[in-house]
């Protein structure tokens, strides 16, 4: 189960345990039920299993849905289905879904649903590594892996759990030759004492290096933030990169960069708070997508409403590349 590419637990009947209640009580002095020790709430939160379902019939439906995106083996391509959703569908919600206030969150899952073929998104691991969203979907009928930041949880930063979740998902896509679509709103590695104790840097770097080792096509859309070392995990080798006007990128978010680089200048100012805001505004202008687009750092700066159309065109362009990816799996199964 734990070594599977996808796993699902029944909420009513399933538990996963290394030792049952009697053994735990005798050895550890803990009085716990099987559900408390290893029920679906425990294991969908800690990442042991991907999804939970109401009963066994619902579990089979989840498995069937997962397999609908998968090829029969690594020697075959994933099945492309007929798509009645217009390639050039441009949803007006995308034009205003990212708030003008950089500190406000938005619904990345809504972005995903508006860009992919309608009702095609199948999320995996929603309860684990919650700052990252991973799942399978379709663009013009072509199965793709979808990875995005969830700014509603820890601002979408890359935590230890999030990095582990992303790494496993990238490896899944690489193994089965699924193109990857990354919707980027990455503020960087999670900071703070707990993040340091959890070795976020090490686990985050593992995700970055896994992305760098892939051979499948990538399309990355800079929706908003793209900062720090963590951002590198969102861009595959020779990937196709699009940017929205709301995109901002750099080594550090403005607030952190100003606080570190201009600490003395701010402290010496007659009005430190005013000076801090002035510096943040100056640097924010440099982190906009326009200088990067002018320097050919992205393939195109687009109206967000064109995202689906551009990604569907990309899917069409990469079709000749996919057969060459078939064969021996590049990654073993790493839980």
Q: Language-model segments: which ranges?
A:
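Ligand-binding clefts of soluble mixed alpha/beta catalytic domains
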Residues: 2-335
């Amino acid at each position: 189960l734990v070594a599977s590419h996808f796993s699902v637990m029944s909420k009513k009947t399933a538990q996963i345990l290394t030792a049952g209640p009697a053994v735990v009580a005798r050895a550890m002095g803990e009085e716990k039920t099987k559900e408390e020790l290893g029920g679906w709430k425990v294991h969908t939160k800690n990442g042991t299993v991907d999804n939970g379902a109401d009963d066994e019939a619902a579990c089979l439906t989840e498995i069937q849905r997962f397999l609908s995106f998968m090829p029969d083996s690594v020697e075959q391509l994933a099945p492309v289905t007929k798509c009645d959703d217009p390639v050039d569908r441009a949803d007006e919600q995308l034009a205003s879904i990212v708030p003008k206030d950089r500190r406000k969150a938005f619904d990345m899952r809504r972005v995903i649903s508006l860009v992919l073929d309608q009702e095609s998104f199948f999320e995996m691991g929603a309860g684990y590594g919650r700052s990252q969203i991973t799942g399978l979907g379709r663009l013009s009928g072509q199965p793709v892996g979808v990875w995005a930041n969830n700014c509603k949880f820890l601002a979408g930063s890359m935590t230890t759990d999030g990095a582990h979740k992303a790494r496993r998902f990238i490896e899944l896509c690489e193994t089965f030759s699924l193109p990857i679509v990354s919707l980027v709103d990455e503020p960087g590695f999670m900071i703070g004492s707990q993040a340091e104790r959890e070795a976020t840097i090490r686990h985050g770097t593992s995700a970055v290096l896994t992305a760098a080792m892939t051979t499948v096509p990538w399309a990355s859309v800079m929706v908003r933030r793209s900062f720090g070392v963590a951002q590198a995990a969102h861009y595959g080798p020779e990937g196709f990169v699009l940017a929205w006007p709301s995109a901002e990128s750099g080594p550090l978010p403005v607030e952190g960069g100003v606080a570190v680089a201009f600490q003395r200048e701010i402290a010496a100012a007659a009005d430190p708070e005013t000076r801090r805001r002035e510096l943040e505004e100056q640097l924010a202008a440099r982190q906009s997508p326009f200088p990067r687009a002018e320097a050919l750092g992205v393939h195109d700066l687009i109206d967000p409403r064109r995202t689906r159309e551009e990604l569907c065109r990309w899917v069409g362009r990469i079709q000749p590349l996919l057969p060459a990816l078939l064969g021996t799996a590049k990654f073993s199964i790493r839980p």
